Amino acid sequence: MTLVKLFFFALSTLGTFELLRLAGRNRIQTHFLPSLTIAVQVSVLFLAGLWNLLPEAAGILYLLGFFGLFLLVVREKSLNFLRKYADFGYAAFLMILMGSALAVKGKMFLQYDNFSHWALVVREMLRFDRFPNFADTLIHFQEYPLGSAAYIYYFAHWVGTTEPLQMLAQAYAIAAAILPLFSRVTGRKPLCCAALLGFAWFVFDYNTAITDLLVDTLLPMVGMCALLFAVTHCKKGCGKFELFCAACYSIWLVQIKNSGIFFLLPIVLVIVPYAHRQKAWGACASVLLAPLVSLVLWQKHCAYVFPAAASTTHAMTLSNYQATLQGKSAEEILTICRSFLTFALTYRGLWLTVVFCGMLGGLVFLLNRPMRKDFIRIALFSAGLYLVYQLGNLGMYLLSMPTVQALRLGGVERYTKTVLLAILYLNMLPMLRLISDTPVKSRALALTAGFLVTLFAFLYLNLGSLEAIFQGREDPAKRQWLESVRVEYGLPEGESYRVLLPAEAANDRGYTYVLTRYTFRSNSVQVLTEDDLGSLSADDANFLLIYGTQSPAVSAWVRTHYPDQAGRPVINLWLE
C-alpha cells in the first residue's frame, strides 16, 4: 500500500513540476523543478498553517498536481513531455532517492535532538493536522520555524506517517536541492552523474545523519540551491514569475531555521543589482520582503498561540536576547568569545576544506582558463560566507543560548559543518564544469580524471566519517527497549513516568529524559538512579521503568514495596 501511495504522490509531484514549467513559459531550468516545487508548497503550507488550514492546503496542493498532469496530457495528447526528465541529472536524482530509501528502511529516530524538537514537532503536526499551539505542552522550542516540518507533514500526510517515510521526505528535499548542480553540465554527463552521486553520498554522511530530521544539512543545500536559482534566472534578466520563485525559495530558506537569514544575504546581493539596473524595485520587492514578512508573521503567530513564546529558548525577540545576554557575566562572555574564535579558526574540517578547494583551484588554473575568474569569485564568496555565518553563530551563543551550553559551545561542530557544506556545494560547480568542459585531449583528460579522483578521495577520507549511511550512528538499544515495554505492558500516553538507570548509565539522563518524554508523550518524566529510590514513596508517579539488569538493591526495594511485581522491568506504582 505504501508503494501505491508513493506512486500517486510522485504523479502529483510530477504534475506540479509541469504546472510550474508552464507558468514560467519554459524559462525555468528543468533541474530546478523538484526544489522549486517544494519551495512553493512550503510557502503555501506555511501560510495555511498560520490560518489553521493545514490539511485543506495539503489536499489542494495534492489535487493541483493531478490537475497539472491531466492538463498536460490533454494538451499534448501524449507522454512526450517526460523526455525532458530522461537525462543523466535526473538519473542521478533517482539513484540518490533509491539509495536514501534503502538507507532509511527499517530505521527509527535515535539522535537526541529528534526527541527534543525536530521529530517531535512533525509527529504532533501529523497527529493534530495543524501547527503546534498552547495545547502542545511537549513543544519546548516554540519559536523554531516549521519550514522543514511543513514539507515532511505534506509528504507523510499522503504517503505514510512512519518514521522511515519522514526520513525519506527530508532526504528527498535535500536531493532536490542538490540536483540543480547538474544545470551547469554541458558534456561528459555520465561522469558528471557519477560525481553528483558521490557528492550526495558525502552530504548525507558528513553532518547530520540521513535518519535524523535535524536541518543542519538541509539548510545549506537549500541556501545554495536558492542562490544558484537567483544567479541562473534573476541575475541578468527575469520576469515576475522568476522573482516569485525566488521569493518562495527565500521563504522556505528562512522558515527552515532562523540562521537561514545568513544564506538569504547572497540572494539579496544578486537581486539588488538587477533591480537597480532595470529600475525594477517594485517587482524585486517580493524577493527582498517576502522572507522578512514570513518571519514577522511567524513571530506574531507564535506570540498569539504560545503565551510565553517570547521568553523560550532561542526565541528571536529583543527581550529574550537581552535576558540571555544579561545572564552571562563579563568573564563568561569573554570565555565564550575566545573559545569560539579559537574553534572557528583552528577547526580541522575548515582547513581540510581550504586544502580541498585549493587543490581544485589549482586544477582550474591549470586546465580551464575561462573558469579562473568564476573560481576566484567562488573562493572570495566562500571566505565571506564563512566569516558572516560564524559571526552569526557567535551572536547566537551570546544572545540566544543558555550560559552552560554556550560555555561548552554546544553543537558548534554541527553548525560549522553547515557552512562548510554550503562552501563545498559551491565548489562542486567548478568541479562539474571541469569534468564537463575540459578539452578532449588524452593528457588533459587523464590529468583531470586523476585529480578529481584524488580530490574525492581526500574529501571522503578527511572530511567525511567513511561510515556507511546504511548502518546508522546511534545505538538503538535504549529506544528499542522502551518501545518493547510500551507495547508489551500496554503503557498509556500522558501518564507520569520514572525511569531508573543503572549507576554506570547515570550520565545518560538527558537522553533518557527526552526519549521517554517523546515515547509516552508525557510532561511528567524523571530519570532516577538507585540513590533516588527513596523519593518514590512520596512521588505521585504512575510507572517506574527499570532499564538494564536490576542490582540487588533495586531488587530488594521492589520486593519490599511491590512484591507482586518483583522481577518486572515495569512497576505500576499505583499497585501495592
Sequence positions of predicted segments:
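Membrane-embedded, hydrophobic transmembrane alpha-helices
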Residues: 1-83
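Membrane-interface alpha helices of multi-pass inner-membrane proteins
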Residues: 43-49, 241-258, 263-269
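Perimembrane helix-loop-helix junctions
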Residues: 70-84, 263-289, 365
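Membrane-lumen/periplasm interface segments of specific transmembrane helices
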Residues: 100, 105-109, 151, 273-364
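Extracytoplasmic catalytic/substrate-binding loops of multi-pass membrane glycan-assembly enzymes
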Residues: 107-121, 127-151
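Hydrophobic/aromatic-rich transmembrane helices and adjacent perimembrane loops
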Residues: 123, 215-223, 262, 403-433
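Signature aromatic-anchored transmembrane alpha helix within multi-pass, membrane-resident enzymes
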Residues: 239-250, 268, 282-292, 431-464
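Membrane-embedded, lumen/periplasm-facing catalytic core of multi-pass transferases
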Residues: 452-512, 518
